[in-house]
């Protein structure tokens, strides 16, 4: 199945972009972010995962206010949907959206969940170049348990 990304020279296999290079049901692409205010009063974490071989996209956003005190509060938002075949539509899951503004330099995270009392519009701006972590391969007997490469990057957050 062709998708809007097939117009770009980004293919990693001879197949359309919508088809993964692995038949592993656990194959995924994922974002994970966290941040805190300078006074450390507020901490948040966000994640968004695309599991194309399971046709699932999941996202979560968690915020902790006054952590480490008797008044600490935590609010969580979780969302899930059928994963779209077109990866161009994969970065919105329920009220959580991740937008790539400048590849490897700036990303926008928005959450619009008034029923949970959470709204945010945050932009991650890199402070360091992305670091490709060493490739991780774990096998038990003949079964591959994990075959992955991750990227880590430091930056600052702007917004509300």
Question: Which residue ranges define each predicted feature?
Answer:
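Targeting-peptide/extracellular-domain and disordered-appendage signature
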Residues: 1-160
